Amino acid sequence: MTKQPEDWLDDVPGDDIEDEDDEIIWVSKSEIKRDAEELKRLGAELVDLGKNALDKIPLDADLRDAIELAQRIKMEGRRRQLQLIGKMLRQRDVEPIRQALDKLKNRHNQQVVLFHKLEHLRDRLIVEGDDAVAEVLTLWPHADRQQLRSLIRNAKKEKEGNKPPKSARQIFQYLRELAENEG
């Protein structure tokens, strides 16, 4: 921020009144460039999101239009559009956008972890049988023991006969339904 000639008089050394709001914070040019580059990366993440995910992020109309345009553009035009989005983000409060984006990423990561746990449980059900069924019933007391045993029996037969794992997929789907109904 450069000072105008009329502001020079405010810096008289004998002036004991200091206004803390007028304090100038010096920021290096490199830091400004790093911040701009970070906002450009945030803009690129927003462009890579799908329409449903974008609906969950608080964006104003101008920024949303710029993002949708960048999604349609290819090559060099896309790079220029990403720079424009970065510039638009510099003029806005990006904290709500970052929080919504982190929330989306976190939800996806939690879902992946849940799916891995359910796959592991499904494999244990097929290998161990009744011991693992008892564990499933302790996790989800409303689970149907008879249906689960039937699916496990069919999955074992399919595995022995080198058939496609249709029942194993059904076990996974059933476990996923139980987990979704719980939460």
From Swiss-Prot:
Presence of keyword Plastid: no
GO cellular component labels: cytosol
Domain of life: Bacteria
Compartment annotation: Cytoplasm
Record has DNA damage as a keyword: no
Principal subcellular localization: cytoplasm
Coiled-coil boundaries: none
GO biological processes: assembly of large subunit precursor of preribosome
Function, in words: Member of a network of 50S ribosomal subunit biogenesis factors which assembles along the 30S-50S interface, preventing incorrect 23S rRNA structures from forming. Promotes peptidyl transferase center (PTC) maturation.
Family: Belongs to the DarP family.
Official protein name in the record: Dual-action ribosomal maturation protein DarP
Highest classification ranks of the organism: Bacteria, Pseudomonadati, Pseudomonadota, Gammaproteobacteria, Enterobacterales
Gene behind the chain: darP
